[in-house]
Amino acid sequence: MRTIISLLLLSAMVFAVIEAISLEEGLQLFEGERGCVGENQQCADWAGPHCCSGYYCTCRYFPKCICVNDNGK
């Protein structure tokens, strides 16, 4: 009886780990598919929206962070 209960608990733990990994991978794919913002648009590196390629987020006038051209930075 103990063996059966142990196997059931082990199976549940394995299932939970597999489910958590697949959920995390799905969230990462979703984050990559989100749109980006361009020059002088409001951004937040830590939470999004993120700047498009060629721009970076600067917070000179916090809390209004904006995307600026990186000019080869």
UniProtKB/Swiss-Prot annotation:
Modification Asparagine amide occurs at: 71
Matches recorded under InterPro entries: Beta/delta-agatoxin_fam
UniProt key word tRNA-binding: no
Keyword list, A-Z: Amidation, Disulfide bond, Ion channel impairing toxin, Knottin, Neurotoxin, Presynaptic neurotoxin, Secreted, Signal, Toxin, Voltage-gated sodium channel impairing toxin
Localization, UniProt: Secreted
Record-annotated disulphide pairs: 36-52, 43-57, 51-67, 59-65
Signal peptide: 1-20
One GO cellular component term: host cell presynaptic membrane
Molecular function, one GO term: toxin activity
Family: Belongs to the neurotoxin 07 (Beta/delta-agtx) family. 03 (aga-4) subfamily. Aga sub-subfamily.
Biological role: Insecticidal neurotoxin that induces an irreversible spastic paralysis when injected into insects. Modifies presynaptic voltage-gated sodium channels (Nav), causing them to open at the normal resting potential of the nerve. This leads to spontaneous release of neurotransmitter and repetitive action potentials in motor neurons.
Record comment regarding domains: The presence of a 'disulfide through disulfide knot' structurally defines this protein as a knottin.
Name of protein: U3-agatoxin-Ao1e
